[in-house]
A protein has these predicted regions:
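Short, surface-exposed loop/turn segments at beta-strand-coil junctions that are enriched for proline
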Residues: 4-10
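A short beta-strand micro-motif common to beta-rich folds, especially ectodomain repeats
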Residues: 10-21
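C-terminal edge beta-strand
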Residues: 23-36
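Surface-exposed repetitive/solenoidal architectures
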Residues: 37-298
Length: 298
């Protein structure tokens, strides 16, 4: 006998009957074919997709299932992350050989194009006791030779505040979009998430806290026109901290970028901060806290 191909992939059921007319006997088997699980192809449409994409990047495995025909990772709609109780950033950082020119080494950074297509990643909460955690807290831990564009984090009605408690390890970076960006472009991105740093930053230990991007090397934030500019609309604030240093060992807090490293190519174009920046630290700025090398255009 022949069973026709299931072209729709829908669940279907049937009965197979075996009979012997000579002895007047028969037997039947009920069969059910479950619906085909369609693999996500061409973009990210659910929180599970985004979590699995992050795992793929962090494991160094293929991300092709989330790429469109142009090879971009794309959001197909707004993504609700309320079901995700513990987020692991996409990519990570190592600060073992920290210098002001090369602050971090990327670990499995995202290296392609991530196009939000104007959609939002909503209800992403990275609140944590950071005492014994990693160094990176954000959507991306690290990007390198990458483009991130047309992406919204949260929305105008968000009530989410990232509550960061404990004592921050040296070189911790907290930034909703990307903690560390090297040789990359970030354009057309907006953040609405708030950051409340109730943790302590120990004296003389560099930490970076930003409403959008933490630390950059040879990276452009904002495009070549106002339409491609980036903005932060969430507040960034800290309580009293032990670190009152004013310099490279101080706490860096800003609305757009906390630390522009001592390397050529850093640029901020058409960036705007609308969020309240309230931080009793040595290096605080509405746009950037420390600019060691680079340019800002508006």
């Amino acid at each position: 006998f022949t069973i026709l191909a299931n072209e729709t992939g829908d669940e279907r059921s049937g009965k197979i009957i075996f009979s012997n007319s000579l002895y007047n006997i028969s037997s039947s088997i009920d069969v059910i074919q479950e619906a085909k699980e369609v693999e996500a192809k061409g973009g990210i449409s659910t929180a599970a997709d985004l979590v699995n994409f992050a795992k793929a990047v962090n494991n160094g495995t293929s991300t092709s299932r989330w790429q469109n025909d142009a090879g971009e990772i794309v959001l197909l709609n707004d993504i609700d992350m309320s079901s995700v109780t513990s987020w692991t950033p996409i990519g990570d950082i190592d600060a073992s050989n920290y210098t002001t020119a090369e602050p971090y080494v990327s670990i499995h950074p995202f290296t392609g194009t991530f196009n939000g297509q104007g959609h939002a990643i909503k209800n992403l909460d990275c609140s944590a006791d950071i005492t014994n955690g990693g160094l990176a807290y954000g959507l991306f831990g690290s990007i390198e030779n990458a483009t991130v564009k047309n992406l919204v984090l949260g929305d105008a009605s968000t009530t989410i505040t990232w509550m960061m408690s404990g004592t921050a390890p040296k070189y911790t970076v907290i930034a909703p979009l990307a903690c560390f960006a090297k040789s990359s472009v970030i354009e057309g991105c907006t953040n609405y998430y708030n950051i409340d740093f109730t943790a302590d930053n120990k004296s003389g230990e560099f930490n970076a806290l930003s409403g959008l991007v933490g630390t950059i090397v040879n990276t452009t934030i904002g495009g070549e026109s106002k339409a491609q500019g980036c903005s932060n609309r969430g507040f960034v604030r800290t309580g009293r901290i032990s670190n009152t240093a004013n310099g490279g060992t101080g706490m860096q807090t800003a609305g757009i970028c906390a630390f522009m490293a001592k390397a050529e190519g850093g640029k901020l174009n058409y960036c705007t901060n609308y969020g309240d920046i309230s931080c009793p630290s040595g290096r605080t700025g509405g746009i950037v806290a420390t600019l060691m090398y680079g340019n800002i255009y508006n």
